[in-house]
Amino acid sequence: MQELIACVDHIRFDLELAVEQQLGAQPLPFPGMDKSGAAVCEFFLKSACGKGGMCPFRHISGEKTVVCKHWLRGLCKKGDQCEFLHEYDMTKMPECYFYSKFGECSNKECPFLHIDPESKIKDCPWYDRGFCKHGPLCRHRHTRRVICVNYLVGFCIEGPNCKFMHPRFELPMGTTEQPPLPQQTQTQQKQNNNQVLQRSSSLIQLTSQNSPVSQQRSPQTIGVMQSQSGNQGNRGPRPLDQVTCYKCGEKGHYANRCTKGHLAFLSGQ
């Protein structure tokens, strides 16, 4: 009723023009400031903003569907360059880690989204086509539907709005792209283990063939090692005549037995 009696759609105030044209907007003192509470730059959406990083308004690029979790804690350093949304929107919050990991969240006022795990499971394209070899072990959802009789005959007037199932006979993916059965994976693992055992046995045979040469050379090497170990074992402490104290510079005692102090080397200069 108010629009019929006193319609003001044809009236344009000077304030509206100033806001649209950003009249009086001062540039930022330095780039990189927090502009989370500022409005969206209308010129940037039209690719006509010449202020760049000094613009006091937010520069939003693309469609941002998820709120930045670092911005929620005040730790996001990307500013306008962030690929996530810097805006508190409950419908675009990121997914709750605890609910997705453990199936429950103890926080009653959790701001993050609690998505049902069942809704994440996709329909099995092979089962929708008619048959899935994985059966109940398939990781995709097997939904039983009633086939539309009219579609099987040749034509259904309901089209995509039909409440019955319209089967699709083309292959959803390559025949080799479907994940293998658990039995097939077990057999492949056994084959790989057998190959490893065969390789190890062949290496053992090669080493056994070369063993006589090593046995012929082993006594000489053993004698050398024994002589070296014997020389090291007979080595005892050096006589005191060959020991030089690094504190006083005299021979005949170790530094830990020196009685002249740590400045004794200055007396000899």
Curated annotation (Swiss-Prot):
One of its GO terms (biological process) is embryonic body morphogenesis. A zinc finger (C3H1-type) spans 35-61, 62-89, 90-117, 118-145, 146-169. Residues 175-195 have a biased composition (Low complexity). A zinc finger (CCHC-type) spans 243-260. Its main location: nucleus. GO terms for molecular function: RNA binding; zinc ion binding. The keyword Cell division does not apply. GO terms for cellular component: mRNA cleavage and polyadenylation specificity factor complex. Residues 173-239 are annotated as: Disordered. It is found in: Nucleus. Disulfide bonds: none annotated. Keywords: Metal-binding, mRNA processing, Nucleus, Repeat, RNA-binding, Zinc, Zinc-finger. Residues 196-234 have a biased composition (Polar residues). Pfam families: zf-CCCH_2 (PF14608), zf-CCCH_3 (PF15663), zf-CCHC (PF00098). Belongs to the CPSF4/YTH1 family. Component of the cleavage and polyadenylation specificity factor (CPSF) complex that play a key role in pre-mRNA 3'-end formation, recognizing the AAUAAA signal sequence and interacting with poly(A) polymerase and other factors to bring about cleavage and poly(A) addition. Cpsf4 binds RNA polymers with a preference for poly(U). Component of the cleavage and polyadenylation specificity factor (CPSF) complex, composed of cpsf1, cpsf2, cpsf3, cpsf4 and fip1l1. This is Cleavage and polyadenylation specificity factor subunit 4. It comes from Xenopus tropicalis (Western clawed frog). The lineage of its organism: Eukaryota, Metazoa, Chordata, Craniata, Vertebrata.
